[in-house]
């Protein structure tokens, strides 16, 4: 399972789900579902989200048990 810190980073950057979704080219619901861990993001989506925040993917997404 992949855990994420999308919500934390959105708060740091003062971004609403709608704005992040617009920047990465998805619907707001997609961001909400990823934040809640309902679905794992595609590699492209994970990459684009990390790019918006200017951090490596592993700063936002972690594979549980990958220590």
Question: Where are these predicted regions, by residue range?
Answer:
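Short basic helix-loop element that most often maps to the first helix and adjoining turn
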Residues: 4-23
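Short, charged recognition helix plus adjacent turn
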Residues: 51, 61-67
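Short, conserved catalytic or interaction motifs in soluble domains
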Residues: 36, 55, 65
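Flexible coil/turn residues that form the inter-helical turn or adjacent wing/linker of helix-turn-helix
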Residues: 2, 13, 42, 53
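Recognition helix of helix-turn-helix/homeodomain-like DNA-binding domains
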Residues: 26-39
